[in-house]
Amino acid sequence: MLPAGPAALSRRARQDKVCRRPSTGCSASLDSLPSEVLLKILSYLDAAALLCAGCVNRRFYHLANDNFIWIRIYSTAFSPRRSHWRVDPAEKTDLSVNLLSAGDKEAGYWKKEYLTKQIASVKAALARVLKPLHPHTGLPVKTKEALRVSGLGWVIILRAADGREYTMEHADLSVNDSSVTVVWYGKDWPPLATLSTLDLCGATPVFMGQSRTPSRIRPRWHSLITKYQLSQLTESSAVGGDRLMRVFCLPPGLVVGLWKREEELAFVMANLHLHCLVERSMLGSPAVPYELPPHTPVSDDSPERGLHGYRLHVDMHSGGASCLCGSFHNLSASKGYLENEYMKLTVISFKNNTEHLPLIGKVGLSWKTNSFDGCIKSCSIMDLTLLEEYGKPFWCFSSPVCVRCCPGPSDGPSFLGEAYCVDYSDSEGRLHMELVWVEETEEYFIVSLALYLRLAKVNQWFGTQY
């Protein structure tokens, strides 16, 4: 072979340069490979990577649904485990039959079977973690462990009127005694005027043990918890503000902060009560929330069933600081307190000074964004858990509440200091709290607290006809 001269080297360099350009003649992409070759490559991927590969384009989606690939993944993940490597011959035969009949199933059959069983294993693991209950609240005591085991998180999906969607990952999360507080903030909010709804969804990884994998790229399924209408951000839903922020409440439990100057989104805070939170965050679909199974009344011949034996646990908190944490037992009502479709439970009475309680510290709703933070005075998050006589949660909520001026204690003696009240209501009941501001100690004292339960809920729960 003759040595290459300068002219030959120059021609070769030009050819290399041309071939490095993105042209149809020289480019070689995975999508140009035969399907048989692509299937061979996909067969080396694990389940998570295979699901991601199916999102590349329509061809990859169909190839990544191959039954022969998925039945091997299924068999490896859920093969029967026996000591000393012994496997039941019948189970081994079933596996062989499944491998032979994989081609007879519709495309994606074994992928669905694998994902169904994988999700069921996540739910089973969570059920074991969530089984121990707190004696006072009746709520799971290992919520933090359940979140760690499952990788459960929450996202909001903002929907524009033109059909566009914006999925936002949470920026902060804290677990309280009776609730979880999830916060979203950032600089990439779409213009509020273009948005119509906000979907709050639970987001659960299909595969456990992927906590180190960025949430955006790991396979997850969404469960719709609540759909909010952003058109309801009006003066009637405002709960307060400061020099930078106006804050609104959209029931149930959603706090929306708007920049005062721009009237654009600054943060969103979801307050989620722990009662059946995991079920609501995992068992729904992206479009339909999970519905709790209907309650079956306990057989009880007592003429006053449903009127006694209630237990209440109530918290008021914000930003990791609690100003109230109290439990109350043996709450009851008489038939004389059944009026206007409500049953009244007196928790704290004016007439018993020993029941009056202070709110510890400053009452305020803390907020933060990437650049600023602040506190909305006279607002707080209230978590309420009411258990009935059999220890089952009867009424639960986690929501912002406001301490507002009121005329004074409605049926009690005159107190020194200004009078305030806190009110909350939803479809199952309402709460009324009355407080007095003590100037000497600079703190609020709760001098009255009453719950009003809807008789329709009481009758449905206990099978009564009050």
From Swiss-Prot:
Coiled coil: none
SMART domains for this protein: FBOX (SM00256)
Annotated keywords: Ubl conjugation pathway
Keyword Cell inner membrane (UniProt): no
Source organism superkingdom: Eukaryota
Subunit structure: Directly interacts with SKP1 and CUL1.
Protein name from the UniProt record: F-box only protein 15
Recorded name of the encoding gene: FBXO15
